[in-house]
Structure formats: structure tokens, C-alpha cells
Amino acid sequence: MGDEVWYATIVGVIVLSGLSIFYILYLAKMRRTKTNAAWKQAATELGLDFTPVTRIFGKYRMSGVIGKQLSCSVWAYTKPNSQGGYTTVMNYDVRFPQRLNNVKELLTPNIQSKLLEVNNVLKKVVVSDDSVNSIGMHGFIRESEILVQNVKLLIQLAELIIPNEEVDSIFEEI
């Protein structure tokens, strides 16, 4: 009688383990489906291209040109951290149509105020001669409204920096 109980216990543990794994994979698939939908909606609203992620740990990315002027990319990926786990990182990059010389001279008080506003939302905002970006933000955004808001903030900042004769409010187009 003891062998049957042992056998039934082993089979029960194996079945429960299998069901648990399938349930976790199912939850991961549902989460990926919702995230793909949110990123697709944000990309459509911004006029960017997005290819849905099909793998469980795939890299999310949307990119394109806004108003024929600014090249815009948003991407997220998972990387190992120092504690042996993984961290998800969000990156935003808006590139100017052409390289600006000495962009620091273009930072008027109005632009500095906008830079502070953007930095309060995105953190780690960097303005260079060829782009405005926020690279390495920890966490992952799954809501389309927040993705759109963050990209629009960077676009607004980039529009303020570009000399006026180069842009006719491309922000109005989106």
C-alpha cells in the first residue's frame, strides 16, 4: 500500500508542476498581448512603426519620423542586474534633422524650463548636438497614454531647440 501512495504523490506533484508552468506561460502570453496592444496604439497615435513582440522576453521597439523632421525611437529591453535578477529599461530618443552646433548656446530660459519639466517626468534627459534622449530609465511602461505623453514631451523639447526656420510646429501634426 505504501508504494501506491508514493506513486500517487509523485504523479500529483508532477501534474501540479506542469499545470503551474502552463499557467505562468499563459499569464505571460496575456501580459505580452496587452502590452503589444498598448504599444501598437501608442505607435499609431504618434505615427510610428511598431512590430509586435512574439517571444516572451522580446525587445519592444517603435520608431519612425515625425513630421518629416524628427527621427523618433522608443525601445525597452530586459538586462541582468547586479543582484542576479533582471531589470527592464525604457529608452527614448528624438534626433534632430541635422546636427546642431553647440546646442548648449541654444538653451534659452524657456528651453531650460521645458528641459526641467521633461526631466521631472523622464529622468536622465540628455540634450546633445544631434538628439534629445532619455536612456536607461528603470521600469516598463504598458499604458499607451503614458508612452504617448513621454514621447510628446521629448518632441516638444526638441522643437524648442531646433532653430525656428527649420521647423513649422511638427508637433501639431501628431
Model-found features: residue ranges?
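N-terminal signal-anchor transmembrane alpha helix of single-pass membrane proteins
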Residues: M1-N36
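Charged, low-complexity intrinsically disordered regions
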Residues: R32-Q69, S73-I174
